[in-house]
Amino acid sequence: MNREKLMKMANTVRTGGKGTVRRKKKAVHKTTTTDDKRLQSTLKRVGVNSIPAIEEVNIFKDDVVIQFINPKVQASIAANTWVVSGTPQTKKLQDILPQIISQLGPDNLDNLKKLAEQFQKQAPGAGDVPATIQEEDDDDDVPDLVVGETFETPATEEAPKAAAS
């Protein structure tokens, strides 16, 4: 090997200045995830308690629902602090409404009215559907009788025509 290559290799392994010990490779420092530990210690100071047996948490924000299934819920009522941890799923309110309608109380009545109005705006022909169904039902009704006319005479007239062809 020539001298230039050796000097280049020597410079890459030296971690300090002139006169320091050479290392074969640089030490890689691991970055520890202290964020979670710091958060847990802060929550412990606030005094949160774990709330068991919560199957689902829904956070409503405009027309979007952030849904947590089987989350870990911690709360400190005195500090008005709620911690919901888990994997969130963002869904539209219209998609999740049939599942959560039983959970909604009377305080959400205004929101339900707004949703109903939005559905009617999205489907403008929705109000006309009962009228069209009613017209189709009229076809199944028995026609009114006409005085002097029977069903037997048209049937006898059609029978010879069918036999001729």
From Swiss-Prot:
Bias type Low complexity, positions: 144-165
Region of interest (Disordered), residue spans: 120-165
InterPro entries: BTF3 (IPR039370), NAC_A/B_dom_sf (IPR038187), Nas_poly-pep-assoc_cplx_dom (IPR002715)
Disulfide bonds: none
Keywords: Transcription, Transcription regulation
Coiled coil: none
UniProt superkingdom: Eukaryota
Pfam families according to UniProt: NAC
Gene Ontology annotations for the cellular component aspect, listed alphabetically: mitochondrion
Residue stretches of biased makeup (Acidic residues): 134-143
All residue ranges annotated as the NAC-A/B domain in the record: 33-97
MF-aspect GO terms: mRNA binding
Record family assignment: Belongs to the NAC-beta family.
Subunit (UniProt): Part of the nascent polypeptide-associated complex (NAC).
Official protein name in the record: Nascent polypeptide-associated complex subunit beta
Protein's organism: Arabidopsis thaliana (Mouse-ear cress)
